[in-house]
Amino acid sequence: MRRVYSAELKLMVLDGLLRAGVRHIQLGSFVHPEILPQMADAELLFHAVPQHDNVIYSAFILNERGLGRAIDCGVKKVETSISLHESYGFKNTGMKFDRAYEEMTRLVRLAHRHDISIRVGLQCAWGVANEAALGPDTVLSYIDKLMALDPDKICLADTAGLATPKMVKEYLDIIIPQIGGKPLVLHFHETRQGGLANIHAALQMGVREFDSSLGGLGGSPFMVNTTGNFATEDVVKLMDEAGIDTGIDRLGLKKTASHLKRTLQSTALKSAI
């Protein structure tokens, strides 16, 4: 995601998401505005959003400065992650795994000290282009490192969009028993067509929480030839068809996505419905 969108547009999208029944929204990232100008308005957004008892607004962070900004905004839920592949991790954060893990350790401690829920994750869990995938056993060893921090949730991200349903099942077969009931979130990208099958495979394994974005917008500016997260409206449709009640109005989502597409005058939105 390289285009910078206005705060007004983001708040318009937020209103549509709330009207459709979405109850957990990652508003932005507290990262350096010169590196990611798309997120320069994070404070503005957190101060502008309507507050509801049943709505969670979270933020992505990478370091203690970002967490400090989140604390100042009254954020009660944050997400952070580190890359399993140092070629990507260094481009994204300027840190190799060991240093990033030390930073994550401090973040978890500080977040809990301030009564903030924190989700920790592994980027590139299913590999990156032109490098061999690490495999489920190796990924499990890194999951153990995350579990040692006692986070509130664990996330596995297919940052490069390379996972297949078979690979998803292979990973989850050994990871789910190991995390002992710790909530697991999956973060997929629709880099290749048919990727919703990955979410379907995870649903069959019992996973119920996935990252998504309206219309499939997004994607890492540090990863070449990737797309955004799965479109929220497509994920909700899949769950509806599986008999899983999300409490989200799919038609309301589609209406908001269509309005966003007209506003942007862009073909960037990738939802299938």
Residue ranges and their predicted role:
Residues 1-273:
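Catalytic cores and adjacent flexible loops of soluble metabolic enzymes
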